[in-house]
Amino acid sequence: MNKRFRCVIAGWLLLMLCACTGGTDEPHIRYYRLASGQSENYLANQACQRFCDMVRRETDGAIQILPSFDNELGTDASALEQCVYGGIDFVRTPISSAAAYAPQLAALQLPYEYTSDKHLFRVLDGAVGQQVMASLEDKGLTGLSYFYAGYRCVFTTGKASTSLEAMKDLRLGTEDSSQMKQVIPMWGAEAVTLPPDEIALALRTDRIDGAESTLPTYVDSGYYQLAPYWTYDRHSYNADVLVASSETWETFSQEEQTIIERCAAEAASWQRDHWQSAEVRAMLHASRSGCYMALLDEEQAEKFRAAVQPIYEHLSDAQKEVVQAVQALADSD
């Protein structure tokens, strides 16, 4: 074998080695799935997209998280179940759904539990929120961040509901939430369970006298045109959780986990700021459109709170401890 032929063979072997290893500069790309309800335009889903984009950038394209919206991968309950077993890698879901795996989470979503959004944020961002989120780990889920889902209030067609007396016998539409189906009768009203896409028709046909929702949904869904009386009772402040399958989580290096946690926190902060801005815009639009935006006086607010106390009495000891910790962080003014 002459010298030139040996050089050709050596060069060919070197090329084959590079082809097999993919070179040292090309990252090994791994793909993951993220499931979420609502449309891609929903603010929490915009935050999910930002989260996926940031993770891709921060890992130089090595980790590619592909989001699916509109419950494409299943309902919240189904997506969480798949996430537990590693069938779906990440899920954004309401706390109420995740509470099926960690009952302490339900203690963060009780009626009239928070005095303001700042109170909620102190809880979610502090030790209480992190400890409660950590309770998911025993069930195969790793909590990453909380997304703010706004406060919910009552809106009605005929008059403002600024007292329990005004609530009596009203038919109020609500989603299939066991808590709201409990709360509304405690106000003296009737709970009418409806999917979100039937609320507007039910208002038009007088099947219901009102409903409860967030301000952005009140405006974006056109409810403000059908039920122009909005009462700031703020019966609940809501949050979603972004979780990862613990099975998937354990495949990431420590550095990758740190990157993912940082991106989740940044996405949550972005979403919170934009949701609060959306609430202000919705309030201005509704009021300028002629809606009556009513406040509860302190006497009536206390009556509303007292009416739902039986819900607190039926909590487990662990949930009551969470509630006490939440109350300790309430606004002082």
Predicted regions and their residues:
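Bacterial N-terminal signal peptides that target proteins for export
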Residues: 1-9
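Bacterial N-terminal signal peptides
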Residues: 8-19
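N-terminal secretory/targeting leader peptides
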Residues: 20-118, 128, 137-333
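Signature of the catalytic double-stranded beta-helix
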Residues: 122-134
